[in-house]
Amino acid sequence: MNTMFKSPKLSPQRLVTLAMLIALAFAIGKLSIPIIPQQLIISPTFIVNVMIGMIGGPIWAFISLAILDIVDNLSSGAGNFIIWWTLLEAVQGLFYGLFFYQKSLSWTNKKDWLHVTIATAIIMLIGSFIFTPLLVQIYYGVPFWAQFAAGRWLKIFEIPIRILVTMAIMPQLQRIPELRKLANFK
């Protein structure tokens, strides 16, 4: 099997940590700010998603973000569960795992800044700029171009914020010995 998709063994400690991170992402997700309802939402959950990818690797991050989306949807009471949204979240989890599993970050390392920039750009391109507008068009009837005209393009300003927050927080968290052990840093 390709080592790119290598995931860690699911130990009880890793399972409990992922479950706690899912709960944390669920709670932090409630702090989301809707700019344009059902279309443009600013959320701080990305930092927890980075941690899930860092600890769980691609496969467990895929599963964890799918579980998070299902729990979030079921608890919302809206009754509008659409499997494609869950798959989109899961695929984003896969990318978080691919980019951040076994990846130690340093504020002073330019290669780490480039790595986080590429990771953030790809994850946001897939999630925020391609598939979310496509799903909104399919399920809510809002044309792709109209979403960008209405303000979806403003998400581009979120990219540098995500990069700065990730590089400010993750190197500090990665200094925790238990987290280093769970993340399998080389």
Swiss-Prot record:
TM region(s), chain numbering: 16-36, 47-67, 81-101, 116-136, 153-173
Localization per record: Cell membrane
Gene3D superfamilies: 1.10.1760.20
GO cellular component, one term: plasma membrane
Topology of the protein relative to the lipid bilayer: Multi-pass membrane protein
Pfam families assigned: ECF-ribofla_trS
Location (main, coarse): membrane
Keyword tags: Cell membrane, Folate-binding, Membrane, Transmembrane, Transmembrane helix, Transport
Xref: InterPro entries: ECF_S_folate_fam, ECF_substrate-spec-like
Molecular function GO terms recorded: folic acid binding
Annotated function: Folate-binding protein that interacts with the energy-coupling factor (ECF) ABC-transporter complex. Unlike classic ABC transporters this ECF transporter provides the energy necessary to transport a number of different substrates. The substrates themselves are bound by transmembrane, not extracytoplasmic soluble proteins.
Subunit structure: Forms a stable energy-coupling factor (ECF) transporter complex composed of a membrane-embedded substrate-binding protein (S component), two ATP-binding proteins (A components) and a transmembrane protein (T component).
Protein name, as recorded: Folate transporter FolT
Encoding gene per record: folT
